[in-house]
Amino acid sequence: MTFPYYASAEQIMRDRSELARKGIARGRSVVILTYADGVLFVAENPSNTLRKTSEIYDRIGFAAVGKYNEFESLRKAGIQLADMRGYSYDRADVSGLSLANTYANALGGVFTEQPKPFEVELCVAEVARYGKPKPSQLYRISYDGSITDETRFLVMGGATEPIAAALKESYQPDLELGAAVAVAVGALATPADSGNGTAASPRVLTAGDLEVAILDRNRPRRAFRRLSAAALEELLPTTGESDAGDSGADGSPSGDSPDTSA
């Protein structure tokens, strides 16, 4: 007589958590931080089509790490929900907190009830309506539906500890856009611990390696805006110059550089 396979509920939840964390850790990191004029998204992402950041509604932005097909379906569902709520009631009734709670309920339900959890971690960011002094808000939603709020910065993806440590040292409230981009890119370039006791040198991230977007509170209606590679190079002239000097080339960095990240 064979006995059916048995695992305790605690073991099942541990296995699901481990699966989700491993999937998220395989993704390249994303930094989201507040600056003087809104919210800045900086993702290590050389792709020009598979985006990690997006607009959800007028004053609300979205960022994610993990399995692309899973967080892309969540992104589209969030846009549809926000559009429906704004159409049915009022555009002012669509808030980042309500959307974050909806995402948390959806991810928590999948984690508890389905055999496989979503291997994603999300951020919903919101800036105040034009002309209002309310501070910007960041909401992190984990694979198990847990939600936390932040008003300074957060890091998602693989090797978050050294990046978060670098941000704690360099981040200051109310930075200008150029300084905020420099802080975020510098933190993303922080190498992970090699494990052999020797300090690794910081990585070099060019404009072609990055996906950068902002929520600009000074824009009257739609706050979300992407920064092109050319605009990013202007914000980070030091990075462009050092990159050219290291390579010995006389051209500026491009999106065609090979991807050397893990």
Curated annotation (Swiss-Prot):
This is Proteasome subunit alpha. Residues 235-262 are annotated as: Disordered. Component of the proteasome core, a large protease complex with broad specificity involved in protein degradation. It is found in: Cytoplasm. Disulfide bonds: none annotated. NCBIfam families: 20S_bact_alpha. One of its GO terms (cellular component) is proteasome core complex, alpha-subunit complex. One of its GO terms (biological process) is modification-dependent protein catabolic process. It comes from Gordonia bronchialis (strain ATCC 25592 / DSM 43247 / BCRC 13721 / JCM 3198 / KCTC 3076 / NBRC 16047 / NCTC 10667). InterPro entries: Ntn_hydrolases_N, Proteasome_alpha-type, Proteasome_asu_bac, Proteasome_sua/b. Its main location: cytoplasm. The keyword Cytoplasm applies. Pathway: Protein degradation; proteasomal Pup-dependent pathway. Keywords: Cytoplasm, Proteasome. One of its GO terms (molecular function) is threonine-type endopeptidase activity. It holds the Pfam family Proteasome. The formation of the proteasomal ATPase ARC-20S proteasome complex, likely via the docking of the C-termini of ARC into the intersubunit pockets in the alpha-rings, may trigger opening of the gate for substrate entry. Interconversion between the open-gate and close-gate conformations leads to a dynamic regulation of the 20S proteasome proteolysis activity. The 20S proteasome core is composed of 14 alpha and 14 beta subunits that assemble into four stacked heptameric rings, resulting in a barrel-shaped structure. The two inner rings, each composed of seven catalytic beta subunits, are sandwiched by two outer rings, each composed of seven alpha subunits. The catalytic chamber with the active sites is on the inside of the barrel. Has a gated structure, the ends of the cylinder being occluded by the N-termini of the alpha-subunits. Is capped by the proteasome-associated ATPase, ARC. Belongs to the peptidase T1A family. It comes from the Bacteria.
